Amino acid sequence: MATEHVNGNGTEEPMDTTSAVIHSENFQTLLDAGLPQKVAEKLDEIYVAGLVAHSDLDERAIEALKEFNEDGALAVLQQFKDSDLSHVQNKSAFLCGVMKTYRQREKQGTKVADSSKGPDEAKIKALLERTGYTLDVTTGQRKYGGPPPDSVYSGQQPSVGTEIFVGKIPRDLFEDELVPLFEKAGPIWDLRLMMDPLTGLNRGYAFVTFCTKEAAQEAVKLYNNHEIRSGKHIGVCISVANNRLFVGSIPKSKTKEQILEEFSKVTEGLTDVILYHQPDDKKKNRGFCFLEYEDHKTAAQARRRLMSGKVKVWGNVGTVEWADPIEDPDPEVMAKVKVLFVRNLANTVTEEILEKAFSQFGKLERVKKLKDYAFIHFDERDGAVKAMEEMNGKDLEGENIEIVFAKPPDQKRKERKAQRQAAKNQMYDDYYYYGPPHMPPPTRGRGRGGRGGYGYPPDYYGYEDYYDYYGYDYHNYRGGYEDPYYGYEDFQVGARGRGGRGARGAAPSRGRGAAPPRGRAGYSQRGGPGSARGVRGARGGAQQQRGRGVRGARGGRGGNVGGKRKADGYNQPDSKRRQTNNQNWGSQPIAQQPLQGGDHSGNYGYKSENQEFYQDTFGQQWK
């Protein structure tokens, strides 16, 4: 054993034999596992110090440690030893996180984070002793509570609407400052502070779940734009945890029961399927559906599995995205709504029929029918309430209609969405790929317009300003889910037929009756008119012309994508939200979907490679 103490300074080596290295009973096990002598000694030193037991580390951690060279493994173990492990529940996972962080720093050429930049452990300990909460630390987040002590709250886990998002948090701020602030709003279920393992500081945002919805709403009122430090204001809003997935490329002949059965075979936690039928054929769906899971975690796992390319449903790898989350409007606002959202209307139903059916309950301000749904504006709320009570579920022209109160728009949300759309338009300077908001299609000319859009009448776009067209939603009613995807099954088909002149820079035609450029023509790129006369471009984006002409050569890529894709050969495309013309909903951020950019104090996005299922995101910005 004498050789184990030689360190190059033999003349200064103490002669006291009591300083001999003491190994634990697991030292030989580490050597047998294949760890180098010095690495095994370093890890065993941690065992002897009582920081970690051998049983705390699983085989995965030992195998990962073996992949490092000796210097790297020793550096990892030293950092692991120096870390405060008192609040780490899964020490094996924590060690793996340290190894991952070390490799990332090694690639970037950065130094190990200064441990002095972390939280004040004395203050954290005092906080935990005062509140009785627990603290679980991983390399990606610090979780305070969840569940809280019985003395604070002994009920069931809080439901949707009890979680808030906190942004613009100073990077060196921790639980000792956040908890005392937010517990004033009400009892906290848990607080999750997202951490950057490369710096040892937080990412600039956190999530706080309260035990009641009232406490969450109170926290937003109290602390949105609150000055938490001199010159530092945090932003607070209600967070919506998403547990729904959008799935495309669904065979149109499949029923809700068949879809539920099939996807339950390949994913876990599926609770419901939201399916919409074609207005003119109730036996066929629209080629997409929404899958609802137990919680966000199971939805994230299902999304990861379905996007792996290894899982096929009906022999096809479908399109999978996060669905837009449902946001519950303020109850006080909903109590003033006088507009009804009516869906499942038969094709024969007109605005005149609707006006006649609903006017018996009170004076109407306006009736607006769009496809197979409509909005009924009452002069007084009492009339709307009576109409919903009497007409909901009743037969109208052969179809049982469904009625709910329409959701008013969130003006701040629309402003944020417009800002994001403007940013996208600057990034992608392609008029037909990202059409401007609220631009009505050209309506001159005769004949059948292109099937590439939604087919809404021109005045519909002014109607959007009055109410968010995608904001109408009541669980599985269309508003929040169906409208944006109304033309999903045929959104890629280019313009056809004779029509009127397309103005320079005008949006491409939408649906029946909206005229495409005059003559047999497609669209030109970047919104400008084509130079040739009478030439029709083929699939992939064509030139815009006047007059009739002969069929031209195959057009280049760009513009609106032409032609349907067959379901069996449907490759994973870019997000459908990023391909649809003139729809502002396309750039709306989705809860729990990674956003681009790494400045979490500004836009709260982070790169996908850093995402874990618990790392929610929110794209709200505060001014």
Curated annotation (Swiss-Prot):
Ubiquitously expressed. Detected in heart, brain, pancreas, placenta, spleen, lung, liver, skeletal muscle, kidney, thymus, prostate, uterus, small intestine, colon, peripheral blood and testis. Residues 504-522 have a biased composition (Low complexity). There is a cross-link at K168, K607 (Glycyl lysine isopeptide (Lys-Gly) (interchain with G-Cter in SUMO2)). The modification Omega-N-methylarginine is found at R444, R496, R518, R526, R536, R539. A motif (Bipartite nuclear localization signal) lies at residues 564-578. Keywords: Acetylation, Cytoplasm, Endoplasmic reticulum, Host-virus interaction, Isopeptide bond, Methylation, Microsome, mRNA processing, mRNA splicing, Nucleus, Phosphoprotein, Repeat, Ribonucleoprotein, RNA-binding, Spliceosome, Translation regulation, Ubl conjugation. Residues 460-488 are annotated as: 3 X 4 AA repeats of Y-Y-G-Y. This is Heterogeneous nuclear ribonucleoprotein Q. The lineage of its organism: Eukaryota, Metazoa, Chordata, Craniata, Vertebrata. The gene is SYNCRIP.
